[in-house]
Regions:
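Mixed-charge interfacial surface used for oligomerization/domain docking
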Residues: 16-20, 24-29, 35-41, 47-57, ...
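N-terminal glycine-rich phosphate/adenylate-binding segment common to multiple enzyme folds
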Residues: 1-21
Length: 184
């Protein structure tokens, strides 16, 4: 791109969960020496997964609308925290294997059907927020959180990405509840 006279806007995975921004900054420094007339802009998305994808989708829309590189960069910097990421799990196995919870807590949590609800904080770190009993309640809580962050509690005119890891039925349950709460 730089060789062809094009500038670069690079959006990284959240620095709160990955060191990729450090590599991007090193690459930027090296490339700026070789291409001093080109512009290389880097944004820490402070996001991951579908939230990262949602931001990228919006930035692509802005590009397609003819916005300049600087305008897209400023939008990303200003609005990256407007994307809300909420995650839950019904399986505590990997929390135990990763050392986040003890084997005892994992066993008890499994028996009690505890579903941890996590989100990304303003530094892009994955933070456990709630321990909710049952999948049905955690799904309802995710959609309640969406309403909490939406304008006027039910006015949601943006896009919503729902992803899953081999849990289609759970994702469908979230989607159904979103569609009932936020008619479009």
């Amino acid at each position: 791109f730089l060789k062809a006279g094009k500038d670069i806007l690079h959006i990284t995975l959240s620095s709160g969960i990955s060191g990729v921004i450090n590599s991007a900054m090193i690459a930027k420094e090296n490339l700026e020496e070789r291409y001093p007339d080109r512009k290389i802009l880097i944004v820490d998305s402070l996001g991951a997964s579908s939230g990262y994808g949602l931001l990228m989708d919006k930035l692509a829309d802005l590009r397609d609308e003819g916005k300049s590189l600087d305008e897209v960069f400023r939008y990303a910097e200003k609005h990256r925290l407007n994307v809300h990421h909420w995650f839950f799990s019904t399986d505590l196995t990997f929390y135990v294997k990763g050392g986040r919870i003890s084997k005892t807590a994992g066993a008890i949590g499994g028996v009690l059907n505890i579903c941890p609800l996590l989100n990304m904080d303003n530094q892009g770190r994955l933070i456990p927020r709630y321990k909710i009993r049952t999948k049905r309640k955690v799904i309802r809580t995710i959609v309640d959180k969406m309403a909490e962050y939406a304008d006027h509690q039910t006015d949601y005119n943006g896009k919503c990405y729902i992803s899953h890891s081999e849990c289609y039925e759970d994702a469908r349950a979230v989607a159904d509840l979103v569609e009932s709460r936020f008619p479009y």
